[in-house]
Amino acid sequence: MSWQTYVDEHLMCDIDGHHLTAAAIIGHDGSVWAQSSSFPQFKPEEVAAIMKDFDEPGSLAPTGLHLGGTKYMVIQGEPGAVIRGKKGSGGITVKKTGQALIIGIYDEPLTPGQCNMIVERLGDYLLEQGM
């Protein structure tokens, strides 16, 4: 299965008639493995800051999580494994696997819990596969 298929079928999947706003699978080095057409153009330093927070949990809290020029307030995640951010009625979930970052961006009517479930389910599967 291609990485694009994981994005299209597993991350951008339909939940009660709704889906994530955008999603991507990105290497730890910031290289894009696959992304939805709506995924924002991001800067390498934004991915570097996210990676730093996985190594040093809490490092993003003072500045917020930035992706594609959008600033998200960092909320409770799982240190070293999952970072969650909120902005208005939407937000972001980032799950770290051995080689990649699984990123989901959502807005209402999708809920934070639905975004977490979608992103973390794929992330857990990839971890089980040694990815």
UniProtKB/Swiss-Prot annotation:
Function of the protein? Binds to actin and affects the structure of the cytoskeleton. At high concentrations, profilin prevents the polymerization of actin, whereas it enhances it at low concentrations. By binding to PIP2, it inhibits the formation of IP3 and DG.
Q: Which CDD domains does this chain map to? A: PROF (cd00148)
Q: A GO molecular function for this record?
A: actin monomer binding
Q: Is tRNA processing found in the keyword set?
A: no
Gene3D superfamilies in alphabetical order? Dynein light chain 2a, cytoplasmic
The record's keywords, sorted A to Z, are: Actin-binding, Allergen, Cytoplasm, Cytoskeleton
Task: Please state where this protein is localized.
Answer: Cytoplasm, Cytoskeleton
Q: How does it assemble?
A: Occurs in many kinds of cells as a complex with monomeric actin in a 1:1 ratio.
The record's comment on protein family reads:
Belongs to the profilin family.
Secreted: present as a keyword of the record? no
One GO cellular component assignment for this chain's record is: cell cortex
Q: What is this protein called?
A: Profilin-3
| Subcellular location, principal | cytoplasm
Q: Which Pfam families match?
A: Profilin
